[in-house]
Amino acid sequence: MTILVLGINHKTASVALREKVAFSDEKRLLALKQIKQTQLAECAVILSTCNRTEVYLHNKNVGPQNDEVWLDSCVQWFADIHQVDLEELKSCLYSQQNLQASRHLMRVASGLDSLILGEPQILGQVKQAYQMSEEYYSLHSDIGMMSTELSRLFQKTFATAKRVRTETHIGESAVSVAYAACSLARQIFDSLRNLNILLVGAGETIELVSRHLLRHGVNGLAIANRTLSRAEKLVEKLETTQKIDIFSLDRLSEGLKRADIVITSTGSPHVLISRNLIEQAQQMRHYKPMLIVDIAVPRDVEESAGEIESVYHYTVDDLHNIIQHNINQREQASQQAEHIIQQESADFFEWLKVHQFSNLIRNYRESAEIIRQDLLEKALQALQNGENTEQVLQELSHKLTKKLIHQPTQAMQTMVKAGNTEGLQAFSHAVKS
């Protein structure tokens, strides 16, 4: 084993445990320092989000004979750095090695392992985690960089995630209520940039809607809420330079008269926007098209509002139908994505095997050259001291043969004990040739 991932996510662990094992930026740097100082691994990348914490490690000195011991050491370190109970952690922890580890990372970065299938934010989080490790090892590694193996894995992963986005429709359809509401608005109106949009409420859903709209360059945004202070706090959280009008619900009729789009999500037990209120607004607007998206449960908008001329009225049930359709599309796209990931992870694993054996061959040749030079130097010294030439050459050839076949002989003995018939057959063919 050279590459290992171990972690927990939203499918294996509770929110409480996920919070305990989360890495802040400061703790992440401490972890990388510990991993280097204890020689737990050559290098590591730590991914920590609200839904998962994963550590990707590379150790070139770990093989089949000691991989379980190394895994146990990594799990113990994981528990120790977060000061959590080892058995509690083990019950929620998953681990993958080499080929499966590379496949897991590619699935994560492509959004196939996310709470919301195909969500795009995770790729940016994986890139950020990689960049933090890259910066750390550029300053603190003996070779001034991350290991070739782990770096290659992440670069391959980024290319794979891009391929998944390009060749499938995994991220094209809205699968959250807030995003679906904004997508619906973009479908009905060619551009949102110069429209007046009224958001009613100041909760989490309206916050998500606000962020989606601001990303699409909306200029005329207004928020109406029962308490102005909560609306003001929402605007502060958005951290935008865009001017956002704020007013209380008693001025709702004024806001409706200016609104091209109304998206509402409050906790009110009663209807806030009556058909009559919308009718009055439409008269003032000369019946220009108005989109109303009512995300609230119970409803904020009177059910018959959609009967008014030029009013497009959608409820949360309509959005859920859209979302379910989109989820089905994403699931179909995920099958294509899995095929791409299977190809790319297999390609990486083939490279990894070739790279490992290239290092093995190079190291063996370097070792043989050191042995040759050492024995030659001793033989030349013996000749200079007047020793018998034939005896010196006999001793040189004997020692050279003995030293050169020592490591291969040990390897064969290990293969015999392990019952590795394929390895022995390959070695036998090589010797015969």
From Swiss-Prot:
Site keyed Important for activity: positions: 104
Reaction(s) the record says it catalyses: (S)-4-amino-5-oxopentanoate + tRNA(Glu) + NADP(+) = L-glutamyl-tRNA(Glu) + NADPH + H(+)
Pathway terms, separated by semicolons: Porphyrin-containing compound metabolism; protoporphyrin-IX biosynthesis; 5-aminolevulinate from L-glutamyl-tRNA(Glu): step 1/2
ATP-binding is among the record's keywords: no
Pfam families: GlutR_dimer, GlutR_N, Shikimate_DH
Top-level enzyme category: oxidoreductase
Gene coding for it: hemA
GO process terms (BP): protoporphyrinogen IX biosynthetic process from glutamate
Lineage, highest ranks first: Bacteria, Pseudomonadati, Pseudomonadota, Gammaproteobacteria, Pasteurellales
Active site: 50
Any further remark recorded for this protein: During catalysis, the active site Cys acts as a nucleophile attacking the alpha-carbonyl group of tRNA-bound glutamate with the formation of a thioester intermediate between enzyme and glutamate, and the concomitant release of tRNA(Glu). The thioester intermediate is finally reduced by direct hydride transfer from NADPH, to form the product GSA.
Name of the protein this chain belongs to: Glutamyl-tRNA reductase
InterPro entries with a match to the protein in the record: 4pyrrol_synth_GluRdtase, 4pyrrol_synth_GluRdtase_dimer, 4pyrrol_synth_GluRdtase_N, GluRdtase_CS, GluRdtase_dimer_dom_sf, GluRdtase_N_sf, NAD(P)-bd_dom_sf, Shikm_DH/Glu-tRNA_Rdtase
Stored SUPFAM superfamilies: Glutamyl tRNA-reductase catalytic, N-terminal domain, Glutamyl tRNA-reductase dimerization domain, NAD(P)-binding Rossmann-fold domains
Swiss-Prot/TrEMBL domain comment: Possesses an unusual extended V-shaped dimeric structure with each monomer consisting of three distinct domains arranged along a curved 'spinal' alpha-helix. The N-terminal catalytic domain specifically recognizes the glutamate moiety of the substrate. The second domain is the NADPH-binding domain, and the third C-terminal domain is responsible for dimerization.
